[in-house]
Amino acid sequence: MTKKTVPVQVQSDLLWEPRSIFWGARLQIAREFRELTQKTLADKVSASPALISLCEAGIKSPSLDLVQAFGEVLGFEPEFFSHEVGDLFHEEQCSFRHRRSAQERVKAKIRAHATLIGMVIGRLKSLLRFPSQDIPCFPLSRGTASEVEEAAESCRKHWKLGIDGPLMQVGRVFERAGVVIVPHLVNTTKIDAFSRCGPTAVIFLNKTIKSPSRWNFDICHEGGHLVMHGGIQTGSIETERAADRFASAFLMPKRAFSRDFSMGDAADWKHIFAMKRRWNASAAAIVRRAFDLGLIDAVRYRKAYKQMSFQKWTVKGEPEEPAFQEPELLADALISLGTRVKVTIDDLRQQLHFTPETFREVTGVVVPPAKLKLSPVIPFSR
């Protein structure tokens, strides 16, 4: 977990230095983004692990050449370390899907990545108009299924979505509420998604998951954490089950879903996949929703999952997936640079003091090469 540090003076006897303040929290963020231990970083910059620890804690001031070495190894310009972290992503604000099976190193990398994305978004918000954050708060007092169902329906009503039909653009619903969806979570099978509720609300999705119906469910699952679990440590069986139930109820409201499901044969896969096309949810989520609502019994539920396992849908993915919906908010904002505002993508990168490669890794956007500026040529007199 990244702790708040105080700035220290950079030690240098060089004639020029970009800035003399060093923030250790930024060093920890950059190191964790690269998944390096303090010892590994120390070896790469020819320092001791103890010195790295003291620099991150704000106790020891690094020399300028060490700051430059940090930047070269971690992929940041030296000036990156001379600014305070305005919006640090703390562990208690973050929710990880499949958190219990994930290594702390991976979770630390994702939190660091999210903090860096927050820096990008903060700059973009100073240049462009973003949707105001409008996440309703429906904390659970009892944690019952009926309470979660009520929270999901209340959230739909708050956003004026109604509870009588499916959602056509699931990601857009949350982005209109000011939640930034980032589609390139670190490449891992241990975490499906990640979210954070704070001054900048974000949902990260796993780019290795190729199922749009699973993405829809993951967005709503993380949305459930944002709506129900603000300020609460998540990752327990209880909070994960509540978020799953929220996602199911938000995607497929009880009354409308029950009506549609009852119009066909519960044992007919053609009916299940027709429901999938209509509700933009996976067949697995539909079967589970039907079981939770008492529309099928335990025997039918277990038979359905056995059939899905036999077809290898749980491993290779289901057929008849809905069309993929690319998140829009962050991409549109970055595309607007250099057109709607004078600041270009490379200007933004330089303001953040990321290297071009780091900017691509953080945002998923390649920095275009700077245009060559031609100087006027003064002809020789003849």
Locate predicted features:
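Active-site hotspot residues in diverse enzymes, especially metal/ion-binding acidic/histidine motifs
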Residues: M1-R382
